[in-house]
Amino acid sequence: VNWVLVNGERETGVTLHYMVENADAGDIIARRKIPILFDDNAYSLYKKMEKESVAILDENWPLIKDGKNNRIPQDLSRSTYFGGRKPEDGRIDWKRKNIEIYNLARAVTHPWPGAFCFLRQKKVFIWQCKPLPVDGLSKPGNLISFDQEGMLLATGKGSLLLKICQLEGEEEVNGYEFAQKYSLRKGEFFT
């Protein structure tokens, strides 16, 4: 689930297949494509995939029981595998494009460990954000402004509106409350 969001994919899917010794290598019984919406995050996409997985099994179980289901051999040369993600993979590099940081944040939001950066040598989690086309206002990681919508930070290309943030060990708050609570000023750098 995480990798398709990190990579900015627009579609994923679920596959019902036979179990064999190698992971995900068994004959395919059925598969379904699932569109990935711009606002989807890891949790919402997981729930979509869960729903489709139940539906695909419900539809195919009678055929499986009767031995009348499809058995399409997989072309393993076309398979792609991505390794597991580790919490440190959630570290934000502000030099990246705003859309890449957005994709990372939505890929590792709750219930996963979260995208994070540092401010004043303290870990800050970014739970919800939004890419904006505002560009060239400052160096990557620089706090450009904040208002009721959140905190606007410069990225390598474009900017990112931080909507829900959390200083490690503290409660989650909206970006504006975060800026107020920690007396942030324009020009501060997130690293």
Task: Describe the residue ranges of each PLM region.
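Short, flexible active-site loop motifs that bind/organize anionic cofactors or intermediates
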Residues: 35, 91, 168
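Donor/substrate-binding cores of folate-linked one-carbon enzymes
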Residues: 1-82, 86-88
